[in-house]
Amino acid sequence: MILMSTLAPDVQKLRIPSHEKSFTLLQAIAVILISAVVFVGAGFAAGKVFFWKSLEESRLDQQLAFYKAKVDAQPKVAEDRVNLGYTYYLKGDYKNALQHLKIATEIDPKYADAFHNVGLVYREQQSYDEALEAFSKAAKLAPRDYKNFMQMGVIYNAQGNYKDAITALNRANEEKPGSADVIYQIGVAAEKSGDKDGARELYTTAVNYDPNFKEAKDALARLGGPKGLEN
Protein backbone atom coordinates (compact mmCIF):
# COMPACT_ATOMS: atom_id res chain seq x y z
CA MET A 1 0.00 0.00 0.00
CA ILE A 2 1.24 3.50 -0.84
CA LEU A 3 1.26 5.98 2.05
CA MET A 4 0.57 9.55 0.92
CA SER A 5 0.37 12.94 2.54
CA THR A 6 -3.06 14.49 2.17
CA LEU A 7 -1.66 18.03 2.30
CA ALA A 8 -2.44 20.01 -0.84
CA PRO A 9 0.71 20.47 -2.97
CA ASP A 10 2.01 23.81 -4.18
CA VAL A 11 0.91 23.30 -7.77
CA GLN A 12 3.02 26.22 -9.00
CA LYS A 13 6.21 24.42 -7.99
CA LEU A 14 5.38 20.87 -9.01
CA ARG A 15 6.61 19.69 -12.38
CA ILE A 16 7.17 16.06 -13.29
CA PRO A 17 10.29 15.48 -15.43
CA SER A 18 9.65 13.53 -18.60
CA HIS A 19 12.45 11.06 -17.77
CA GLU A 20 10.80 9.88 -14.53
CA LYS A 21 9.90 6.20 -14.65
CA SER A 22 7.42 6.33 -11.76
CA PHE A 23 5.30 8.94 -10.04
CA THR A 24 3.90 9.49 -6.59
CA LEU A 25 0.17 9.77 -6.14
CA LEU A 26 0.56 13.34 -4.89
CA GLN A 27 2.37 14.30 -8.10
CA ALA A 28 -0.34 12.63 -10.15
CA ILE A 29 -3.01 14.70 -8.45
CA ALA A 30 -1.03 17.90 -8.91
CA VAL A 31 -0.42 17.35 -12.62
CA ILE A 32 -4.09 16.73 -13.28
CA LEU A 33 -5.38 19.64 -11.21
CA ILE A 34 -2.97 22.09 -12.84
CA SER A 35 -4.54 21.55 -16.24
CA ALA A 36 -8.12 20.88 -15.13
CA VAL A 37 -10.86 22.83 -16.89
CA VAL A 38 -14.63 22.53 -16.60
CA PHE A 39 -16.90 21.88 -19.53
CA VAL A 40 -20.54 20.95 -19.84
CA GLY A 41 -21.32 17.55 -21.35
CA ALA A 42 -24.47 16.69 -23.25
CA GLY A 43 -26.84 14.13 -21.80
CA PHE A 44 -29.73 11.95 -22.95
CA ALA A 45 -33.18 11.74 -21.40
CA ALA A 46 -33.69 8.55 -19.41
CA GLY A 47 -36.70 7.61 -21.49
CA LYS A 48 -34.51 7.16 -24.57
CA VAL A 49 -32.32 4.46 -23.05
CA PHE A 50 -34.39 1.47 -24.11
CA PHE A 51 -34.89 2.79 -27.62
CA TRP A 52 -31.17 3.33 -28.10
CA LYS A 53 -30.35 -0.09 -26.65
CA SER A 54 -32.64 -1.79 -29.16
CA LEU A 55 -31.23 0.32 -31.97
CA GLU A 56 -27.69 -0.52 -30.90
CA GLU A 57 -28.37 -4.27 -30.94
CA SER A 58 -29.83 -4.02 -34.43
CA ARG A 59 -26.85 -1.97 -35.60
CA LEU A 60 -24.41 -4.51 -34.15
CA ASP A 61 -26.14 -7.36 -35.99
CA GLN A 62 -25.82 -5.44 -39.25
CA GLN A 63 -22.21 -4.58 -38.48
CA LEU A 64 -21.42 -8.22 -37.73
CA ALA A 65 -22.90 -9.39 -41.03
CA PHE A 66 -21.01 -6.66 -42.89
CA TYR A 67 -17.59 -7.55 -41.48
CA LYS A 68 -18.17 -11.30 -41.75
CA ALA A 69 -18.79 -10.79 -45.46
CA LYS A 70 -15.63 -8.69 -45.78
CA VAL A 71 -13.50 -11.28 -43.97
CA ASP A 72 -14.96 -14.08 -46.09
CA ALA A 73 -14.07 -12.13 -49.22
CA GLN A 74 -10.57 -11.07 -48.06
CA PRO A 75 -9.49 -13.20 -45.09
CA LYS A 76 -5.98 -11.73 -44.86
CA VAL A 77 -6.95 -8.09 -44.24
CA ALA A 78 -5.99 -7.44 -40.61
CA GLU A 79 -8.20 -4.36 -40.22
CA ASP A 80 -11.33 -6.28 -41.21
CA ARG A 81 -10.43 -9.04 -38.74
CA VAL A 82 -10.07 -6.46 -35.98
CA ASN A 83 -13.41 -4.87 -36.83
CA LEU A 84 -15.09 -8.28 -36.87
CA GLY A 85 -13.43 -9.31 -33.61
CA TYR A 86 -14.38 -6.05 -31.94
CA THR A 87 -17.99 -6.47 -33.05
CA TYR A 88 -18.06 -9.93 -31.48
CA TYR A 89 -16.58 -8.35 -28.35
CA LEU A 90 -19.37 -5.76 -28.22
CA LYS A 91 -21.92 -8.57 -28.53
CA GLY A 92 -20.28 -10.46 -25.66
CA ASP A 93 -19.04 -13.34 -27.85
CA TYR A 94 -15.50 -13.40 -26.49
CA LYS A 95 -14.50 -16.74 -28.01
CA ASN A 96 -15.09 -15.57 -31.58
CA ALA A 97 -13.69 -12.14 -30.74
CA LEU A 98 -10.35 -13.61 -29.64
CA GLN A 99 -10.25 -15.96 -32.62
CA HIS A 100 -10.41 -13.15 -35.17
CA LEU A 101 -8.30 -10.68 -33.20
CA LYS A 102 -5.48 -13.19 -32.78
CA ILE A 103 -5.59 -13.95 -36.50
CA ALA A 104 -5.21 -10.20 -37.07
CA THR A 105 -2.05 -10.14 -34.92
CA GLU A 106 -0.66 -13.00 -36.99
CA ILE A 107 -1.47 -11.26 -40.26
CA ASP A 108 0.14 -8.02 -39.05
CA PRO A 109 2.34 -8.42 -35.94
CA LYS A 110 2.85 -4.62 -35.82
CA TYR A 111 -0.86 -3.76 -35.73
CA ALA A 112 -1.25 -2.10 -32.31
CA ASP A 113 -5.05 -1.94 -32.43
CA ALA A 114 -5.24 -5.71 -32.82
CA PHE A 115 -3.28 -6.26 -29.60
CA HIS A 116 -5.28 -3.54 -27.84
CA ASN A 117 -8.54 -5.30 -28.66
CA VAL A 118 -7.13 -8.66 -27.56
CA GLY A 119 -6.41 -6.95 -24.25
CA LEU A 120 -9.99 -5.68 -24.00
CA VAL A 121 -11.39 -9.17 -24.40
CA TYR A 122 -9.02 -10.68 -21.84
CA ARG A 123 -9.85 -7.85 -19.43
CA GLU A 124 -13.57 -8.63 -19.69
CA GLN A 125 -12.78 -12.27 -18.98
CA GLN A 126 -10.68 -11.19 -15.97
CA SER A 127 -7.64 -12.88 -17.53
CA TYR A 128 -5.53 -10.01 -16.29
CA ASP A 129 -2.05 -11.35 -16.99
CA GLU A 130 -2.94 -12.03 -20.61
CA ALA A 131 -4.61 -8.63 -20.88
CA LEU A 132 -1.53 -6.84 -19.52
CA GLU A 133 0.67 -8.69 -21.99
CA ALA A 134 -1.55 -7.62 -24.89
CA PHE A 135 -1.78 -3.97 -23.78
CA SER A 136 1.98 -3.89 -23.19
CA LYS A 137 2.60 -5.07 -26.76
CA ALA A 138 0.16 -2.48 -28.07
CA ALA A 139 1.87 0.25 -26.04
CA LYS A 140 5.27 -0.64 -27.48
CA LEU A 141 3.86 -0.49 -31.00
CA ALA A 142 1.92 2.75 -30.40
CA PRO A 143 3.64 4.60 -27.53
CA ARG A 144 1.64 7.81 -28.07
CA ASP A 145 -1.75 6.11 -27.73
CA TYR A 146 -3.00 6.79 -24.21
CA LYS A 147 -5.62 4.02 -24.29
CA ASN A 148 -3.14 1.19 -23.78
CA PHE A 149 -1.61 2.81 -20.70
CA MET A 150 -5.06 3.61 -19.32
CA GLN A 151 -6.19 0.01 -19.70
CA MET A 152 -3.02 -1.19 -18.00
CA GLY A 153 -3.86 1.16 -15.13
CA VAL A 154 -7.40 -0.20 -14.94
CA ILE A 155 -6.07 -3.74 -14.62
CA TYR A 156 -3.42 -2.83 -12.06
CA ASN A 157 -6.16 -1.19 -9.99
CA ALA A 158 -8.26 -4.35 -10.24
CA GLN A 159 -5.25 -6.36 -9.06
CA GLY A 160 -4.56 -4.01 -6.16
CA ASN A 161 -1.21 -2.96 -7.65
CA TYR A 162 -1.72 0.77 -7.15
CA LYS A 163 1.91 1.81 -7.60
CA ASP A 164 2.05 0.39 -11.13
CA ALA A 165 -1.46 1.72 -11.76
CA ILE A 166 -0.32 5.26 -10.98
CA THR A 167 2.73 4.91 -13.23
CA ALA A 168 0.65 3.65 -16.16
CA LEU A 169 -2.13 6.19 -15.65
CA ASN A 170 0.28 9.10 -15.41
CA ARG A 171 1.69 8.04 -18.77
CA ALA A 172 -1.86 7.97 -20.13
CA ASN A 173 -2.44 11.46 -18.73
CA GLU A 174 0.77 12.68 -20.41
CA GLU A 175 -0.45 11.45 -23.77
CA LYS A 176 -4.00 12.75 -23.31
CA PRO A 177 -4.29 15.38 -20.57
CA GLY A 178 -7.78 15.88 -19.23
CA SER A 179 -9.29 12.46 -19.91
CA ALA A 180 -12.08 11.95 -17.37
CA ASP A 181 -11.57 8.18 -17.50
CA VAL A 182 -7.87 8.46 -16.70
CA ILE A 183 -8.48 10.96 -13.89
CA TYR A 184 -11.15 8.70 -12.40
CA GLN A 185 -8.83 5.70 -12.41
CA ILE A 186 -6.10 7.67 -10.64
CA GLY A 187 -8.79 8.58 -8.13
CA VAL A 188 -9.49 4.88 -7.63
CA ALA A 189 -5.79 4.29 -6.91
CA ALA A 190 -5.80 7.22 -4.48
CA GLU A 191 -8.88 5.99 -2.63
CA LYS A 192 -7.68 2.41 -2.40
CA SER A 193 -4.28 3.64 -1.18
CA GLY A 194 -5.92 5.55 1.66
CA ASP A 195 -5.73 9.11 0.30
CA LYS A 196 -9.41 10.00 0.53
CA ASP A 197 -8.88 13.76 0.09
CA GLY A 198 -6.78 13.24 -3.01
CA ALA A 199 -9.38 10.84 -4.37
CA ARG A 200 -12.15 13.39 -3.84
CA GLU A 201 -10.16 16.01 -5.75
CA LEU A 202 -9.66 13.62 -8.63
CA TYR A 203 -13.27 12.43 -8.72
CA THR A 204 -14.43 16.05 -8.59
CA THR A 205 -12.19 16.90 -11.53
CA ALA A 206 -13.45 13.88 -13.49
CA VAL A 207 -17.07 14.99 -12.95
CA ASN A 208 -16.17 18.55 -13.98
CA TYR A 209 -14.90 17.16 -17.27
CA ASP A 210 -17.86 14.81 -17.69
CA PRO A 211 -20.94 15.70 -15.59
CA ASN A 212 -22.59 12.42 -16.64
CA PHE A 213 -19.76 10.22 -15.32
CA LYS A 214 -21.85 7.97 -13.05
CA GLU A 215 -18.98 6.03 -11.46
CA ALA A 216 -17.17 9.23 -10.50
CA LYS A 217 -20.38 10.76 -9.11
CA ASP A 218 -21.07 7.60 -7.09
CA ALA A 219 -17.52 7.69 -5.74
CA LEU A 220 -17.96 11.32 -4.71
CA ALA A 221 -21.20 10.50 -2.91
CA ARG A 222 -19.40 7.71 -1.07
CA LEU A 223 -16.65 10.10 0.05
CA GLY A 224 -18.90 12.95 1.14
CA GLY A 225 -19.49 15.00 -1.99
CA PRO A 226 -17.39 17.12 -4.34
CA LYS A 227 -14.17 18.62 -3.01
CA GLY A 228 -14.69 22.24 -2.00
CA LEU A 229 -18.41 21.87 -1.19
CA GLU A 230 -18.03 20.52 2.35
CA ASN A 231 -19.67 23.52 4.02
Task: Please describe what each predicted stretch is.
Residues 56-69, 91-103, 113, 124-137, ...:
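Structural signature of tandem alpha-helical TPR/SEL1-like repeats
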Residues 73, 107, 141-142, 175-176, ...:
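Structural marker of alpha-solenoid helical repeat scaffolds
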